[in-house]
Amino acid sequence: EVIEVFAYSCNHCFNFETNIELFEKTKAQYIDFKRMPVVFNEAYKMHARMFYTAESLGILDVMHIKIFKAFHLDRKQMMTESEIFELFSEQGISKDQFENRFKSFTVESKVNRAERLTRKYKIRSTPTIVVNGKYTSNGPSTRTFEDIIAVTRELALKEYSSK
């Protein structure tokens, strides 16, 4: 399992997106790739709620990059429910659909799980890659985005080979 831990408000994560998309398309079949929004505090919870709401509505593929662009190109803060809904409404999502998912037990549970895993994996910065719950991409061998991807592939192969 390979998890990309990211934050929509993180400029490095936005810049890393091209690399991680390429990784996702070219990863080995044995790699189960997932994304997880980091949850450091209440502001990050709101951002995680956006991710899991988009996922539950089946529009994450479209919304993921749109949310990044809203932060980094349009300079939106995305801190209020109404501002977030505005972005979702551009995809044809009604206010009722949005509110039912945004405040749902399922979305809240996933946000809480992301918060627990943020602590468990000792995430201090983003983007961070977690391989099999054991290894993270922080350290002297990962100075560039390409290094992060290379180390991720090596660690995933190591874990797969040790089974």
Q: Residue locations for each model-derived region?
A:
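Structural alpha/beta surface segment adjacent to cysteine/selenocysteine redox centers
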Residues: I3, Y8-E86, E154-E159
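C-terminal cap of thioredoxin/glutaredoxin-like
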Residues: E90-K163
